[in-house]
Amino acid sequence: MWFENKVTSNKEAFLQKVRLICAKLGIEPDWLMFVMNSESGLNPAAYNPNGGASGLIQFMPDTAKGLGTTTEALRKMSNVAQLDYVYKYFYPYRGKMNSLYDLYLVTFFPAALGKPDSYVLQTSTLPAKVIADANPGIDLDHDDRITVGEFKRWIDLKKKSMGLETGFDVFVIAGSFICAGIILWYILKRDNDD
C-alpha cells in the first residue's frame, strides 16, 4: 500500500482499518493513503491555522461539526479512531468515487465530483479567485481559477514527484479493480510464449 512506511503509530491496526473502510466505500486503499499523505502527511494531529483544517484529510471546522465532532477533538484522536470520521465523510459519495481524482475532488471540493474538466471550482459565495489564491500550487495556469482538469493535472504532478508513476492506470469495473497494465502484460507474455 502506498505510504504505509510513513505510518508511525498503530501501523497494523491503521492499515487494516484503511483496507476495511476502502472496501466498504469501493475505493482503492492506495487512493485514500495518497490523499491522507498529501493532506496531512498521515498525521492525525495535523493543523492548518489558515482556516483551521485538521486531521488526516484536513477536515474544515464546519465539516467536522456536520460529522458530529470538532477539529480539536479530531486532532486529539488516534489515527485509527479518526478513520471513523474519514469513513463517515466519504460515505455519502460511495459508488461515485471511481478514481483517485474523484476521491481527491470529494476531499477538496465535493461539488466538482462528476463535473467536466472545464468546470471551475467556485460557488455563489466563494469566488474562483479566492479558491485559487488560497491554493496557488493547484492554480497551475496562474489564471486565478482552478478547473477540474487543472486539479487532475496537479494530482498527476504530485504522483510523479512522489515516484508513483506506474505506467498504467487502474480502472474500476463492476466493483472489481483490474490493473490494465497487468492484463496487457499477461496477454503479451501469453502470445510470446506460444
Language-model regions: role of each:
Residues 1-141, 148, 152:
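Catalytic glycan-binding domains that act on GlcNAc-containing polysaccharides
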Residues 1-2, 190-194:
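Short acidic DE-rich linear segments
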Residues 18, 63, 155, 172-175, ...:
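Prokaryotic Sec-type signal peptides and long signal-anchor helices
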Residues 153-167:
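Short, aromatic-rich amphipathic segments at membrane interfaces
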Residues 166-192:
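Single-pass alpha-helical membrane anchors
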